[in-house]
Amino acid sequence: MSGGVKLIAGLGNPGDQYARTRHNVGAWFLETLAQQRNQSLAKENKFHGFVAKCNDYWLLKPTTFMNESGQAVAALARFYKIKPSEILIAHDELDFPAGDIRLKEGGGHGGHNGLRNIIQHLGSSDFYRLRIGINHPGYKDRVTPYVLSPPSENDRIAILAAIEKGLRLIPELVQGDFQKVMRELHS
């Protein structure tokens, strides 16, 4: 992959009942980024989401449910001719503790239905993922209710700190300095 990020999408489910849930931490990331950049996210039906143009890159918060996120990402990417390698997806990551944040280049969906749908709609897995740790409930049968509930106060504070850490590295992501971002986040 080469070049910098031209599209940043933050995954989550629409609606107030999901806004504070663990599954929406990608949307938390995107909303905070838009606020920091003084951008208003405007609803764009053709992109199935809320969108803002931020200098040389786009912000996207899908209005689809998580497992249909690919509709929004692919619609905006195709319209603006953004390659998968120029896309960053911010999402919740069960396999990391709350407070961890890591950048991953390409790969599979790891059981994440939002990523699975994005791969399907793009026809490629060659995009970047900003994986925001939310902890794991310990048992597979508890995952759905866990991700659809709010984090504990301690976990929420750790998640917000991880988001801030990721937001500080947006300039490097846009410039394509992915190795620097990985060094910063993974050390």
UniProtKB/Swiss-Prot annotation:
GO terms for cellular component: cytoplasm. Keywords: Cytoplasm, Hydrolase, RNA-binding, tRNA-binding. Its EC number is 3.1.1.29. Coiled coil: none annotated. The record marks N13 as: Discriminates between blocked and unblocked aminoacyl-tRNA. TRNA binds at Y18, F65, N67, N113. It catalyses: an N-acyl-L-alpha-aminoacyl-tRNA + H2O = an N-acyl-L-amino acid + a tRNA + H(+). Pfam families: Pept_tRNA_hydro. Belongs to the PTH family. Monomer. This is Peptidyl-tRNA hydrolase. The lineage of its organism: Bacteria, Pseudomonadati, Pseudomonadota, Gammaproteobacteria, Legionellales.
